[in-house]
A protein has these predicted regions:
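Catalytic machinery of carbohydrate-active enzymes
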Residues: 1-345
Length: 345
C-alpha cells in the first residue's frame, strides 16, 4: 500500500510494534521530537494505536494490521519507509530481543506456522546475561532515538474519558482511597498468586480502601469470590485498555506486575507497587515516580532477574504448589500489604 511518499515538512517516523507497555514507553519520545521542530509520525499496529490515538504529540499514524507485513519482509518495508522521512527511528526488538532475550518460538508467516530460531544468548549464564542486559529500558529507547534523558511516558485520555473516570469513582467507589490492581501481564510470570490474600488482609485492616481489579477476560477467573464484596470492583474483561488507563488519574495506589498499566502510571502521583519478574529495578522502575519496587525473596536455583522472554513454562521455572512462576510466587505478600497500608493513610 502507498505510505504517503516523501513528507514535505521535517518529519520523524518512529516504528514500534508490540503491546500496550511498549507503546507507553515509546510515547516518551514524541514530545522530545516536537521540541526539535519535527512532525511526529508513528508506525504502529492495532494494539499500540489504541493507546496513542489521542496523543497530542502525534501528528500522523501509519497503522498496519498485526503481521500485515510478514516478519521476513520487515527490513525491506522499513527501507522503503526510511526514504519518506527526514529521520527514522526503528525500535522493534530494541527491548524484547536486545535486553529481554528471545527463545525459539513459532510464528505465523503467510498463514503458516514457522519455527523461528531464538537468540544464542538465551543459553548464557544468568551472570553473563545480567552484565549485558541490565540497562534501563527508557534510557536505551532515548539513546536509540538520539534524544536527552527527559522521560515522560504518558497516556492522554480524552475529555470524555476523563469525565467517565471521575463519574465512575464517584458512583461506584465509596472509600476514600482507591487501589487499582493489574492482575496479569502478557507472560506466565506476570501474575501474582497471593492477590486474594493481600486484598483480604488490607480490607480487614482498614475501612478506608477500595480495590479495582483489571485485566483481560481471562483475568475474570482471578476475580472469583470478590463479586459480592462492595469494596472490590471487578472490571477484568469489562473495561477497555483506554478506560483502565483513563482511570489511573483517580487512583491513589496502582499495584501489579510488569505491565503496560504500571508503565502508564510510572510518572503519575499515585503510588506504584510493581512486582518484578524478568526485569530488574535498573531495567524498569529506576526513573519511576513514587514507587515501591518488589523483588522475589531468594529461592533454590535463583533465576531472578533472568532478562528473558518466556512464552510458557517450558522456559520459566514453575512452583509446583501454586502453579505460578517461581519469581512471582516468592514476592512477599507482607511487603505489598505494608506498602498499601502505608500509602493509604
Amino acid at each position: 500500500d502507498d505510505v504517503g511518499g516523501r513528507r514535505s515538512e521535517k518529519t520523524v517516523c518512529i516504528v514500534r510494534y508490540g503491546g500496550f507497555g511498549d507503546m507507553i514507553q515509546t510515547s516518551s519520545l514524541f514530545p522530545q521530537f516536537k521540541k526539535k521542530g519535527y512532525r511526529v509520525c508513528v508506525n504502529v499496529t492495532e494494539r499500540g494505536y489504541d493507546v496513542i490515538k489521542s496523543d497530542p504529540n502525534v501528528d500522523e499514524i501509519l497503522l498496519q494490521a498485526t503481521d500485515q507485513v510478514p516478519n521476513d519482509c520487515l527490513n525491506e518495508y522499513w527501507s522503503r519507509l526510511t526514504k519518506c522521512f527526514h529521520d527514522f527511528i526503528q525500535l522493534s526488538e530494541s527491548i524484547e530481543g536486545a535486553l529481554l532475550v528471545i527463545p525459539d518460538r513459532t510464528e505465523i508467516i503467510r498463514g503458516k506456522p514457522v519455527l523461528i530460531k531464538g537468540s544464542p544468548r538465551y543459553s548464557l549464564s544468568k551472570e553473563e546475561l545480567h552484565e549485558q542486559c541490565n540497562v534501563n529500558y527508557m534510557e536505551r529507547t532515548h539513546d536509540l532515538a538520539g534524544v536527552p534523558h527527559e522521560f515522560l511516558p504518558k497516556f492522554y485520555p480524552t475529555k470524555k474519558e476523563k469525565k467517565w473516570a471521575r463519574k465512575t469513582k464517584e458512583t461506584e467507589i465509596g472509600s476514600n482511597k482507591v487501589v487499582l490492581w493489574s492482575l496479569s501481564g502478557s507472560s506466565c510470570h506476570k501474575v501474582y498468586p497471593w492477590t486474594d490474600a493481600v486484598i483480604s488482609e488490607v480490607l480487614s485492616k482498614t475501612k478506608n480502601v477500595s480495590f479495582v481489579t483489571i485485566g483481560d477476560a481471562l483475568c475474570q477467573m482471578l476475580e472469583g469470590g470478590w463479586e459480592d464484596e462492595p469494596r472490590v470492583l471487578t472490571m477484568s474483561g469489562e473495561w477497555s485498555i483506554r478506560e483502565t488507563l483513563a482511570f489511573l488519574d483517580q487512583c491513589d495506589i496502582v499495584v501489579g506486575p510488569e505491565t503496560g498499566v504500571l508503565n502508564a502510571a510510572s510518572t503519575l502521583n499515585a503510588h506504584k507497587i510493581v512486582m518484578l519478574s524478568h526485569s530488574s529495578k535498573e531495567n524498569l522502575s529506576k526513573h519511576w515516580k513514587n514507587t515501591t519496587t518488589l523483588e522475589p525473596e531468594h529461592y533454590e536455583d535463583f533465576c531472578f532477574p533472568c532478562h528473558k522472554m518466556h512464552y510458557g513454562f517450558d522456559t520459566c521455572k514453575r512452583d509446583e504448589y501454586t502453579g505460578g512462576a517461581m519469581c512471582s510466587v516468592n514476592i512477599n505478600a507482607k511487603e505489598i500489604i505494608t506498602a498499601i497500608l502505608d500509602n493509604s493513610k
